[in-house]
Design a protein with these regions (language model features):
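ABC ATPase "signature
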Residues: 211-212
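Helical segment within the ABC ATPase nucleotide-binding domain
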Residues: 167-179
Length: 241
């Protein structure tokens, strides 16, 4: 779609003398899936934190659904970190009820029911988080984000800890979610980006090394596919599933 839900203009972030990201121009359309690829330390997490309103740009501009103040952005963002941030002694249901309450979500019961269904959690709804596997914790983290009724969903390495079947199921659900909200995620997995994204950004050392569809990135770099292009522009190895 032509309307952008998320926009970064000339975004630069410095920590003391270290530049985490430099002159980043990034957009994510409404009701779309946008992927960030890159090796560790490339700047993916910095961009995600900026989109979530967790950090300020040193220079440049960040806009999410027309909002630029972090306190406004945080109200419309659902964030799923690579390592789930969950209260160990709460049950799955209690976790979601608490999250919906914090955001004063309308129709909270329906939102929770939908999140449980999307994340395949109905069979563990009464289980405490501390008794769940890593894969289940990741799904609870996603369900928690959905309960805040976000306009933009941000996922950092969302498939970490999931088995192949769970990964495919979650990808299918993300595609469905993108019919209603904007989804932005980071990943090391080429197949994940190809499967889900029409718009892909490849980062290297804090700058955008390539941007476009999987096909256009490959073509622009004289490669047969996105895997070859990723290796060429980053000089890194590739993670297959």
């Amino acid at each position: 779609m032509s309307n952008n839900a998320v926009k970064l203009e000339s975004f630069t972030k410095k920590y003391a003398e270290k530049i985490a990201c430099s002159s980043i121009d990034f957009t994510a359309g409404e009701c779309s899936v946008t992927g960030l690829l890159g090796p560790n330390g490339a700047g993916k997490s910095t961009i995600l934190k900026a989109i979530c309103g967790e950090i300020y740009p040193t220079t440049g501009f960040v806009s999410v659904c027309g909002f630029s103040k972090p306190e406004d952005i945080k109200k419309i963002i659902g964030y799923v970190p690579e390592i789930p941030e969950l209260e160990e002694n709460l049950t799955v249901k209690e976790t979601l009820v608490l999250e919906a309450g914090l955001y004063s979500v309308k129709d909270a019961v329906d939102r929770i029911k939908e999140a449980l269904s999307i994340c395949q959690l109905t069979d563990v709804v009464s289980c405490k988080v501390k008794n769940l596997s890593k894969g289940y914790r990741q799904r609870v983290s996603l369900a928690k984000a959905l309960c805040s009724d976000p306009k933009v969903l941000v996922l950092d390495e969302f498939s970490a800890g999931l088995d192949p079947v769970q990964t495919v199921q979650l990808r299918n659900n993300i595609k469905k979610l993108s019919e209603k909200i904007t989804v932005i995620f980071s990943t090391h997995h080429i197949e994940e980006a190809v499967s889900l994204c029409k718009d892909i950004y490849i980062l290297k050392r804090g700058v955008i090394a390539a941007h476009g569809t999987a096909e256009s990135i490959a073509k622009d770099n004289g490669c047969h596919n996105l895997e070859e292009a990723f290796l060429k522009v980053t000089g890194e190895g590739i993670i297959h599933e």
